[in-house]
Amino acid sequence: YTTILGEVYLNHELSNTENVGGYFSHHSSAGGIEGLRLDDDFTKTNLNIHYSQKLRDFSWKVDGGFDLQTYNWYGLPDGFYTDAQISEIDSGHAFHSFYAGGKLKFDDAIIKEGSVRFRRFGDDQDSGENRFVAKVSFDVPVQDEIISTEFYIDYISGSFDRSFNTTDELKYGNVIFGLAPSYQIKQDDLTVNLGVNLVYLNDNEFDESKFFIYPNIEASYRLVDEILIAYGGV
């Protein structure tokens, strides 16, 4: 069988502060495994393009791309289907997705960085999913100390043409709001990050909401300088 595999990376410096680049990959096979009763070819294609710029006080980057994939589910149990039934089976399945996002990073400000990303996923069986994620990291001064904090929103919604047991359309969706403050303590070779993750979850389809509190604690100790570090977290 014939297989094609290729990748291309491109990067170009437009100026001292601007950069543009891209990535393309393709992997496919014409199939031809002996003894199969169904098609077994597949393709995977990916494309990404990005642009970035670094200014005096901040830098930013935007990117976007898409993924295309086709597969064949060619496994069959012996003696379960007749030749007529096998000839009617459509074993192909195609997936596609596209995404776009951006990131902004400040060099010396209370707000350290922020990012957004949207992705749309679907297939040829009328399934689809949308996801949007936004994050912002900032420092909160408390007297002479700094509390590093991250706030994020994670939204997802999707649907299937039908559920497994019925022909009714199956939908799902929820949105998460999270706040994660953290305080760092350093003493000699010991570093401790004390934090907590506050999460609010709202289920859009079932009209339910929940609130969670998770510990976010990490500690590291340098046993041998630049060679061995002990680490633990919860």
Please place each PLM-identified region on the residue numbering.
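Transmembrane beta-strands of outer-membrane beta-barrel pores
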Residues: 1, 26-30, 66-72, 106-108, ...
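Outer-membrane beta-barrel translocator/receptor signature
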Residues: 1-34, 39-45, 58
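Residues that define the transmembrane beta-barrel architecture of outer-membrane proteins
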Residues: 2-4, 41-45, 92-98, 128-134, ...
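Residues on the lipid-exposed face of transmembrane beta-strands in outer-membrane beta-barrel proteins
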Residues: 8-12, 22, 47-53, 96-106, ...
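Surface-exposed extracellular loop regions of Gram-negative outer-membrane beta-barrel proteins
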Residues: 12-33, 150, 172-203
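Outer-membrane beta-barrel strand-turn architecture
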Residues: 13-16, 53-57, 106-110, 140-144, ...
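Transmembrane beta-strands of outer-membrane beta-barrel proteins
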Residues: 20-22, 60-64, 112-116, 132, ...
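Flexible loop and strand-edge segments within Gram-negative outer membrane beta-barrel domains
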Residues: 29-50, 61-131
